[in-house]
Structures are given as structure tokens and as C-alpha cells.
Amino acid sequence: MFEEFYEMYEPEEQEVVALINRCIGGGYNWKGNFWEMTVVTLGVVFCDTAKVSTKEERLEWPVTDEERNSEKGWERFQNEQICRLKIRQMKEEWAKDLVAWPWCISQVVKAHEDCPELQAVLDEYHKPVVIQDQVLGELTLDKDHDVFEGEIQWRGKDVLLSLEVNAESKPSWTRARSAAKKLLADCETWDKAMRELVAKNLTELANNWLSQDEENPRDPGTDPITEEELARRISLTSLSVTSGGSFTAWFDCDEMFTDHAVTVYGSLKKGLKTANIEG
């Protein structure tokens, strides 16, 4: 039943030893009525050349709906597993518009393989990466999620900072840090603008929520939440910045939207985009 899936890949097989990073799930193939599962690698040794590649590869295989949550699907590979596989690369006609050309797994030759070269890759992966930035402070790289995490002072208050980067591309680290510094350098202006946008977009909704809160004695009909009050009561808790200069700011809403958070989206180039409640 998986003929349509395997037809997207070249017939030639390559034998490899792969270091699995993690399974990232799969998309549903509506035409073939099956799931396409995907794991990404930390490293691959191509057996014909003995070449070690640390470029992330995507390895895919098809499963039925019943198999998806079994040892044939999500449980087929474990994080940091080293295994010997036979794989086939996707045909150009299917992969030409993709950022990276995936491979399909045609056979698991050996589920667990000893490979000193890939063990060295794994050992290097486990080494912590910490940057000491004079403005942003200590930033620690979460390699699994391609993000640096730290804490900054935003208008005198502690705010969690996340920098979304490509863990394998140090220039992206520099760009994300630069974007965060630009936001921080003009934090008074950005903070005021974000609060004004939230107040403009969400004050009416805040009063609707208040009217439905039976435990709150305040009557929005006679004592409504004003835009000024809403802008004052929210507080920035975390900020996420990409290497391209886009950012997302999360605000605590002082229970005006129960346990939901207020999020503001924007970019350095285009300014603020929108404000929503989420969570």
C-alpha cells in the first residue's frame, strides 16, 4: 500500500550508519491514506566513502494509522540511537522545492551499531555552548530546539530571552544577538508601543471576560477596564527574537484573561504586527 511513497525516491540504495537526533513526527498523506514518519540525524557515515557528515538529514518511512503510535512509528528509533540503514534519496522532481532533500529508509540493517566517529559527534553535541554577552548576559544554547536562552533587564525587570537561531550557523547567532540588542536599546519606545497595541486590540475583550467572571464583583457596565488600565496592568515576562529580526513578546495579563497570556508579534523592520491572547 506504500507504493506511492517509495516511487518518490530513487531506486539506488546507500548504506549508512546514522546517529538519530529525534523523531519529529509525520504528515498525513491523504492520497495514499498513510502517515509519513520523519527522524532527523545528528550525523551520518556513508559506508561507500566512509565520509562523516554532520549536516542534518531527514529520514522518512510510511506507516498506517494503526502503526503510527507503535514500534513501527514513533517508537521505531530512539534519541541518540546509532544504527545501520539502507536509504534512498528523494527524486529531484519531488525534492526540487524543498530546503533539504529527504531520504527514505528502505531497510534497518542493524538497530544498534558501534561507531566511534558518530560517538565523537554525539560527545561534541553534548558539550554545552555558552556565550557571555556584555549586553545580553549569559546565553545558553539549547541544541535540540535551536535557541539560545537567557535573562535580560527590560525597563528594570527580569525578562526571559530566547534567541531563535540555526545551531549549526554561528552567523545566525550574531544576527539574533544584534536584533535583541536593538530592541533592548530602544526598550522604552517598544514597550510603550506594545502596551498601546494590546490596549487598543484587547480592552473590549477584557471587559467581555470581566462580565462573564462571576467571582469578580466589578461591573464592567459601571466600572469598565480602560485602555490605560489594561496597558498598565500587563507585564512583559519573555521575549523571543529571531535571527531575521522578528520577535514575539509574552505579557502576563494580571488575570484579566484568567490564565491566558497576551502575545505581541512584530519585527524591527516592519514594526508591530498584532496582539492576541494565547494559552
Could you describe each region identified by the protein language model?
Residues 1-47:
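Structural detector for short beta-strands of small beta-barrel domains
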Residues 119-140, 226-246:
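Extended, Lys/Arg-enriched charged tracts that mediate electrostatic binding to polyanionic substrates
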Residues 122-190:
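Contiguous hydrophobic, core-forming segments of folded domains
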Residues 161-226, 230-233:
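Long, charge-rich alpha-helical interaction segments
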